[in-house]
Design a protein with these regions (language model features):
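HKD-type phospholipase D/PLD-like phosphodiesterase module
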Residues: 70-124
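HKD (HxKxxxxD) catalytic microenvironment of the phospholipase D
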Residues: 113-154
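Hydrophobic, Leu/Ile/Phe/Ala-enriched alpha-helical segments that form helix-helix packing faces
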Residues: 51-58, 98-109, 196
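Cysteine/selenocysteine-centered motifs that mediate thiol-based redox chemistry or coordinate metal-sulfur cofactors
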Residues: 160-212
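PLD-like (HKD) phosphodiesterase/transphosphatidyltransferase domain
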Residues: 1-79, 166-171
Length: 212
């Protein structure tokens, strides 16, 4: 039996990344996980500025940045997906800008920022912002993922407990949680968990025991 997510409260479709909704979610979140390949745009835009403000808040707990370091079999092809009209050398500069931005956040906030380099092939951009989840998609297109379709999930409006997403990220989803909503959302969280890697993840779980 299929279930229409669009008939449920807590699910919105956006034609292009809804920056206003994203900023609103960041303002309210104390735990954030970003799995978006590169973050060069954040270096000088409102999202990056707000993240910097949140990191300075005493209530903020953790920002996990999954930073892509692509491998050769798909590196060039993925570059054309990220920036279709940009030469490969220019895309590499974006990667370098992204590395610098991430490293600077880690330097300024060593306890609050988990910076993770991953070589896992990204399947979609995923922004886990507290109790809201923003998911886009990559495509072989002349437009970027930011201009494509995005889905916004509000887990509270969907009837899940507060902090469900971040709890799944740290601890996984139990097999008992098998509702259609949980199964759908957990796939995106599992994608982030897989990109993180087992060794790093075990250290995060150990650290998290002292925070919750």
């Amino acid at each position: 039996m299929t279930h229409s997510l669009l008939s449920k409260p807590g699910v919105k479709l956006h034609f292009g990344l809804n920056t206003h909704a994203l900023l609103e979610a960041i303002t309210q979140a104390n735990d954030i996980v970003l799995h978006a390949a590169i973050y060069s745009n954040f270096a000088d835009n409102a999202v990056g500025q707000l993240l910097l403000q949140r990191l300075q808040s005493v209530s903020f707990k953790q920002l996990t940045l999954l930073k892509l370091e692509p491998t050769s079999p798909w590196r060039d092809e993925f570059a054309t997906i990220l920036r279709p009209d940009m030469p490969l050398l220019e895309v590499e500069r974006l990667y370098e800008n992204s590395r610098h931005w991430c490293a600077e956040l880690k330097r300024q906030f060593p306890e609050a920022v988990n910076l993770v380099s991953t070589q896992a092939l990204p399947l979609q951009p995923i922004l886990l912002i507290g109790d809201r989840l923003f998911v886009g998609h990559y495509a072989h297109s002349h437009t970027t993922s930011a201009q494509g379709l995005w889905i916004e999930f509000d887990v509270i409006a969907l009837g899940l407990a507060p902090n469900s997403l971040i709890d799944w990220f740290y601890s996984g989803v139990t097999t008992e949680q098998d509702s259609p909503v949980v199964i759908t959302l957990s796939r995106y969280v599992e994608e982030c968990r897989r990109a993180v890697g087992d060794l790093w993840y075990q250290s995060v779980i150990a650290l998290d025991k002292g925070r919750h």
